[in-house]
Each structure stands twice: as structure tokens, then as C-alpha cells.
């Protein structure tokens, strides 16, 4: 359902968009994002025989890493944002899971040992693939990209949601371009020998308030980028759009998590 408003098609533009995730408010709002489908992890683990080391790229506050920590001897959770890794470390301390939190870019990170599994969420879009994937090809046989943490279809209906996105993306200086966004979102696949792709549908209940909060964890709608007044107006309009579809303030969301897995390549394959 979430469709990026700004198509970051150059390295400098991708770096600028990725910098939004260093903001402390974005890190706080990230906790309101829905989870990925639980069945996805069960399926993924069956594709990976080893259980020694895993690496989660662009880990945020540990949405994927903390699940992997239940199954691997060591999980390295890597993110350039101090706010994200601090949030993850604090939550992980309560769970007492064996996650090593590393504040570093994927481009700069080095490891003397390999990994049984490397994972990434939407952070895969912002990486410099020419720098990162040759390292991944030397470290692991399996990379898994996990996406889809907003409902499909939108709870207010696709037509109303598209109109909302088109209007608001324009207001923050972007252009609604779902085709361009989809092309950008799959750019990393040239660096993978894909073994498979599987969609996991599930349902999730979320309050309207938390749904709106989760939007501000995204680069397009971060409060730092929008400014206080515009963000408040965005919240009011989105609340008015969603509230008629809620029961007792709760939305019943139909979700789809998508898993794409395969072998990382040291150079892009011809497409």
C-alpha cells in the first residue's frame, strides 16, 4: 500500500532519502509499523541449513533481527542510524536475545567471517549495490529480502488512498509515480540469482492512531521533512479518511509480506 513519493534514482538522492532514518522521531515511529507475516520466517528458515551467523542490513530497531536471534547463534544487526540501533538495543536488552548491534553503513562494514543468512527489508533500496553486493557474495550463499508492512488493499479503498497519496506527495515536493517506484524497488534484483519469491498473506489489527504514527516512520512523511504544521494537517486528514473504516478505533488490515531469496552476485546479471 505504501508507495514512495520521491523516486531516488541517483546515489546522492538515495543517500539523501536514507538520511531520514537517522532522525530520532522516525525511529520512535518505526515501532508502530506492523510486523511481517510470522509464517514467512518459518519458510525462510527452511531454506537456510546453517544456524551460526546471520546479518540484517538496515536493521532499524530490529524488526527482523530479533526474530532471527531466536534461531541463530549470532545475529549482527547493522544500521547507520544511532537512533535506530539504540532503540533496538534497548528493546533487545529486555528480551535478552543475542544480537550484536552495529552502527555502521553496509558500504563501510567489514567482517572476517561469513554468514549463513543475510536479510534486508526496504533498506535494500538505499544501498550502493556496487559496493555492498560483492561483499555479500563473499560472505553468504543466501540473501533474503523481505518487504510489505502496509495493508493491501488500503483500508479506505485504493481509489481514495491513491487520491490521498497523489495530493500529499505533491504537497511535500514529490510526484506520485508508482511505476517508477516499483522499478526502483526492484533494482537490487540484478545483483541476485533469485531462487524464489513467495507472498504471505495475513491479517493484523491496528489502531488508527498507530497507523498514522507508522506513516511518519517513512522518509516521505517524516515529521522532520514535513514540518510540525504540515504533519499535523496530514494527520487530521488521514484520520478523517480512515476513521469511517475503523471499529472502535481499530482497523482490520489485510497484509501481504513478500519474501525474495537467492544468492548474492559479485556483479549485476544481464537483464
Regions found by a protein language model. Name each.
Residues 127-135:
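A short, conserved alpha-helix within the catalytic core of class I
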Residues 138-205:
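Conserved catalytic/acceptor-binding region of the Class I
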Residues 52, 73, 116:
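Conserved acidic residues
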Residues 55, 61-108:
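Class I SAM-dependent methyltransferase SAM/SAH-binding core
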Residues 110-117:
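A short acidic, Gly/Pro-enriched loop at the edge of an enzyme's catalytic core
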Residues 122:
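Short catalytic micro-motifs in class I SAM-dependent methyltransferases
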Residues 2-49:
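Conserved class I S-adenosyl-L-methionine
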Residues 184-271:
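Conserved Class I S-adenosyl-L-methionine
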